[in-house]
């Protein structure tokens, strides 16, 4: 089959989950509900952290950035899917597809970096509490977040430019509900070896850094917690990182199922459904995990609601 240069491609077709009208209506309602809950929850977390000066600490600075990344992450994919269902279309422009790929990779990797940074923050808070303010200075916090944004922006740009260099066959149907890197590579007529090599090297290196940061940080955290003599002290120390551990488990577990499962067990429909877990469900649950498990967030939420009641007519 003759290849077609990318400059002549005008659009791709996102096959999504189903072509049945009734199923699409159910999907539209479900995803719209999850999207609105996700956006409202994450924006509320950001609002609470900004308005409550007691939460102006490194831990909540990182949490606010994670909530922003979650809101942007889901906004990269779900609105386009909802719009396509609404107008009964599967099309996405070529430039729109590459743009979606860029921002998807940016925010998914940013989330991984922020989770690793938050693990380091918990390590310092629990293992070096007397030096916490000195180590986690405002300058370091801003540097860690800024570096995460910049590195992942460049990382995503590299993969998007490499994707732009490929040529595609006549089949432009993507068996997914958004433009992910694996489905796009499978449509290429050109040899994607360079793309796959760069993914293996850069993705493996960044993934290894994040995983090592998580493992080393929490190995030291648990070692320190076990040395605390009182049961109350252990519970208080563990409560500091329990929410973060829950979010890491959700994000990493669902991502691992999609990208690192054996090829023999993978199918397009299965991957699409599994992708929903880490692209939509996990970001939606994160605000609930942090608000339900974190006493300071719950207290700040109550104060915010109380202030609004007082000032309401």
Curated annotation (Swiss-Prot):
<dbReference type="GO" id="GO:0007165">
    <property type="term" value="P:signal transduction"/>
</dbReference>
<feature type="transmembrane region" description="Helical; Name=7">
    <location>
        <begin position="273"/>
        <end position="292"/>
    </location>
</feature>
<keyword id="KW-1015">Disulfide bond</keyword>
<dbReference type="InterPro" id="IPR000276">
    <property type="entry name" value="GPCR_Rhodpsn"/>
</dbReference>
<keyword id="KW-0325">Glycoprotein</keyword>
<feature type="disulfide bond">
    <location>
        <begin position="97"/>
        <end position="189"/>
    </location>
</feature>
<feature type="topological domain" description="Extracellular">
    <location>
        <begin position="80"/>
        <end position="100"/>
    </location>
</feature>
<feature type="transmembrane region" description="Helical; Name=6">
    <location>
        <begin position="237"/>
        <end position="259"/>
    </location>
</feature>
<keyword id="KW-1003">Cell membrane</keyword>
<feature type="topological domain" description="Cytoplasmic">
    <location>
        <begin position="50"/>
        <end position="57"/>
    </location>
</feature>
<feature type="topological domain" description="Extracellular">
    <location>
        <begin position="159"/>
        <end position="196"/>
    </location>
</feature>
<feature type="transmembrane region" description="Helical; Name=4">
    <location>
        <begin position="141"/>
        <end position="158"/>
    </location>
</feature>
<protein>
    <recommendedName>
        <fullName>Olfactory receptor 1G1</fullName>
    </recommendedName>
</protein>
<feature type="glycosylation site" description="N-linked (GlcNAc...) asparagine">
    <location>
        <position position="5"/>
    </location>
</feature>
<keyword id="KW-0297">G-protein coupled receptor</keyword>
<feature type="topological domain" description="Extracellular">
    <location>
        <begin position="1"/>
        <end position="25"/>
    </location>
</feature>
<feature type="topological domain" description="Cytoplasmic">
    <location>
        <begin position="220"/>
        <end position="236"/>
    </location>
</feature>
<keyword id="KW-1133">Transmembrane helix</keyword>
<feature type="topological domain" description="Cytoplasmic">
    <location>
        <begin position="121"/>
        <end position="140"/>
    </location>
</feature>
<keyword id="KW-0807">Transducer</keyword>
<comment type="similarity">
    <text>Belongs to the G-protein coupled receptor 1 family.</text>
</comment>
<dbReference type="Pfam" id="PF13853">
    <property type="entry name" value="7tm_4"/>
</dbReference>
<feature type="transmembrane region" description="Helical; Name=1">
    <location>
        <begin position="26"/>
        <end position="49"/>
    </location>
</feature>
<comment type="function">
    <text>Odorant receptor.</text>
</comment>
<feature type="transmembrane region" description="Helical; Name=2">
    <location>
        <begin position="58"/>
        <end position="79"/>
    </location>
</feature>
<keyword id="KW-0812">Transmembrane</keyword>
<dbReference type="GO" id="GO:0004984">
    <property type="term" value="F:olfactory receptor activity"/>
</dbReference>
<dbReference type="GO" id="GO:0004930">
    <property type="term" value="F:G protein-coupled receptor activity"/>
</dbReference>
<feature type="topological domain" description="Extracellular">
    <location>
        <begin position="260"/>
        <end position="272"/>
    </location>
</feature>
<keyword id="KW-0552">Olfaction</keyword>
<feature type="topological domain" description="Cytoplasmic">
    <location>
        <begin position="293"/>
        <end position="313"/>
    </location>
</feature>
<keyword id="KW-0675">Receptor</keyword>
<dbReference type="GO" id="GO:0005886">
    <property type="term" value="C:plasma membrane"/>
</dbReference>
<keyword id="KW-0716">Sensory transduction</keyword>
<feature type="transmembrane region" description="Helical; Name=5">
    <location>
        <begin position="197"/>
        <end position="219"/>
    </location>
</feature>
<keyword id="KW-0472">Membrane</keyword>
<dbReference type="InterPro" id="IPR000725">
    <property type="entry name" value="Olfact_rcpt"/>
</dbReference>
<feature type="transmembrane region" description="Helical; Name=3">
    <location>
        <begin position="101"/>
        <end position="120"/>
    </location>
</feature>
<dbReference type="InterPro" id="IPR017452">
    <property type="entry name" value="GPCR_Rhodpsn_7TM"/>
</dbReference>
């Amino acid at each position: 089959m003759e290849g077609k240069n990318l400059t002549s491609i005008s659009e791709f077709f996102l096959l999504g989950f189903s072509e049945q009208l009734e199923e699409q209506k159910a999907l539209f309602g479900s995803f719209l509900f999850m999207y609105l809950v996700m956006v409202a929850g994450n924006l509320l977390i950001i609002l609470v952290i900004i308005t409550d000066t007691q939460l102006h600490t490194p831990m909540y600075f990182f949490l606010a950035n994670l909530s922003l990344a979650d809101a942007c992450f889901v906004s990269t994919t779900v609105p386009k899917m909802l719009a396509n269902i609404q107008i009964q279309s599967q099309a996405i422009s070529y430039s729109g597809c590459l743009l979606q790929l860029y921002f998807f990779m940016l925010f998914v990797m940013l989330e991984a970096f922020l989770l690793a940074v938050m693990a380091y923050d918990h390590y310092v808070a629990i293992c070096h509490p007397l030096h916490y303010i000195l180590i986690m200075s405002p300058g370091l916090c801003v540097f860690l977040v800024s570096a995460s944004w910049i590195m992942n922006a460049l990382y995503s740009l590299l993969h998007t430019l490499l994707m732009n260099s490929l040529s595609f066959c006549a089949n432009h149907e993507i068996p997914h509900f958004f433009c992910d890197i694996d489905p796009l590579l499978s449509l290429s007529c050109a040899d994607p070896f360079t793309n796959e090599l760069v993914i293996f090297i850069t993705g493996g290196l960044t993934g290894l850094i994040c995983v090592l940061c998580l493992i080393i940080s929490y190995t030291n955290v648990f070692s320190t917690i076990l040395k605390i003599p009182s049961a109350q002290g252990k519970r208080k120390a563990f409560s500091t990182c329990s929410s973060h551990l829950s979010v890491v488990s959700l994000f990493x577990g669902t991502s691992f199922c999609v990208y690192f499962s054996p090829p023999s067990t993978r199918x397009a429909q299965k991957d699409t459904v599994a992708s929903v877990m880490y692209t939509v469900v996990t970001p939606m649950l994160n605000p609930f995990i942090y608000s339900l498990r974190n006493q300071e967030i719950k207290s700040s939420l109550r104060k915010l609601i109380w202030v609004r009641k007082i000032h309401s007519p």
